[in-house]
Amino acid sequence: VLLFALFTGQDPQQLLDVIGGGQATVDPNAPQAPTGAPSDEHGQFAATVLASTEDAWSEIFRAQGQSYRAPTLVLFTDAVASACGTASSAVGPFYCPADQKLYLDLGFFDLLAQRFGAPGDFAQAYVIAHEVGHHVQQLLGIADQVTAAQQRAGEAQANALSVRMELQADC
């Protein structure tokens, strides 16, 4: 996020807020995400970027004697139900560790272009790779370690751990 903010001239905290999303709430009546191959340009691009991250992380995990379990890409519009609860477009892209799925509202790409002046493939790929970073943190147990540390920490330290977690997901 920091590098992206420097590249685009945006406030890093504002970008963290948008990319990190908000809290999902459970709503059993929420629309379910469509399944199958994406048919629009943004969806096809997202699937291609995700496939590229799968290739890279599979190789990195293999070099460590482990196997990589890729997340599932879920494309949605307006709202979606996940194992982490229901999320609206306002949440932005998010990774749900409970179902190991990466949720992406394709309208978010338009928001990147219009609100943050970050149109194009780089910004879109960056967001997808960031969410995959959260998946890797979950697979390696880092997310659980950070959550445990946050529960023992004061508010300022817990927030600092959140920022570090977001920055690591960028890597």
PLM regions: where:
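A Zn2+-metalloprotease active-site environment signal
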Residues: 1-171
